[in-house]
Amino acid sequence: MGLQPSPVLLASLGVGLLTLLGVALGAYLVRRSRRPPVTLLDPNEKYQLRLLDKTTVNHNTKRFRFALPTAHHVLGLPVGKHVYLSARIDGSLVIRPYTPVTSDEDQGYVDLVIKVYLKGVHPKFPEGGKMSQYLDSLKIGDVVEFRGPSGLLTYAGKGKFNIQPNKKAPPEARVARNLGMIAGGTGITPMLQLIRAILKDPEDPTQCFLLFANQTEKDIILREDLEELQARHPGRFKLWFTLDHPPEGWAYSKGFVSVDMIREHLPAPGEDVLLLLCGPPPMVQLACHPSLDKLGYSPKMRFTY
């Protein structure tokens, strides 16, 4: 007959196992309790957020800061996603997408950087921007409806992207070691969101390349943020500008996004390459995509916000 374990030994083992389980459960609950509460709990719900502050960024752009429910709340926006703001303006419901320039490391508030398109300034848009003018008219303490997270792209970290071909399709996994980005105007905000997320992780191998197009030098928003990131991570982030109307002595490119600009400043087509585009539709459709076609970037290598 084999030796039978004593009841005392079995009891000791049982107590030890229960102790380990208790410690593990306690650690999990502590970690969970330390997680800040999330604002955007349901992507189909609207959340009213109060305007905290409004500051001027440049001649036509402002930063709007909205309060979250408490000083400990985070927005709850995965990297790659955006929010929708909605308001009833002149009797009509107006909805616009925006990507915050803050992240879930910021508690108690969310910041949006938005160009304010004023009435009677641009001949193609005589009425200006409905939502941007509405936001600019708000007083401190006024509320705006937020909804999200929204969007077809999510960044999971370390070069892993989950991209939905459309809203009803399941996400498809993509791995990109070289991330090229073409942004125009306020299309820079989703790019900055991604760049920050990648560069803050020292173990993320993704290389970032940004081509940022604007009309004039004074139109370049978030330039200081971008140049600071480039200076701190010169081996991981390459930054290039192009202007329609550059000043004398301009050190970067001139004109619309072109084949030569893309060839020189963005990663070449490849299995480990993903190109993201965000900007005015004419720039994206008439300048970017035709140039990418000529250079051999397949549809799988591109994503347009």
From Swiss-Prot:
Enzyme category, top tier: oxidoreductase
Task of the protein: NADH-cytochrome b5 reductases are involved in desaturation and elongation of fatty acids, cholesterol biosynthesis, drug metabolism, and, in erythrocyte, methemoglobin reduction.
Major localisation: membrane
Cofactor(s) listed: FAD
Residues holding FAD: 136-166, 175-210
Residue ranges of every copy of the FAD-binding FR-type domain listed in the record: 44-156
Keywords carried by this UniProt record: FAD, Flavoprotein, Lipid biosynthesis, Lipid metabolism, Membrane, NAD, Oxidoreductase, Steroid biosynthesis, Steroid metabolism, Sterol biosynthesis, Sterol metabolism, Transmembrane, Transmembrane helix
Its membrane topology: Single-pass membrane protein
Family per record: Belongs to the flavoprotein pyridine nucleotide cytochrome reductase family.
Alphabetical list of PANTHER family matching this protein: NADH-CYTOCHROME B5 REDUCTASE, NADH-CYTOCHROME B5 REDUCTASE 1
InterPro entries: CBR-like, Cbr1-like_FAD-bd_dom, FAD-bd_FR_type, Flavoprot_Pyr_Nucl_cyt_Rdtase, FNR_nucleotide-bd, OxRdtase_FAD/NAD-bd, Riboflavin_synthase-like_b-brl
Origin species: Bos taurus
Gene from which this protein is expressed: CYB5R1
Gene Ontology MF term list: cytochrome-b5 reductase activity, acting on NAD(P)H; FAD binding
E.C. number: 1.6.2.2
Family annotation (CDD domains): cyt_b5_reduct_like
Catalytic activity reported: 2 Fe(III)-[cytochrome b5] + NADH = 2 Fe(II)-[cytochrome b5] + NAD(+) + H(+)
GO biological process, one term: sterol biosynthetic process
Protein known as: NADH-cytochrome b5 reductase 1
Record's GO cellular component terms: membrane; mitochondrion
Residue ranges crossing the lipid bilayer per the database entry: 8-28
Locations listed in the record: Membrane
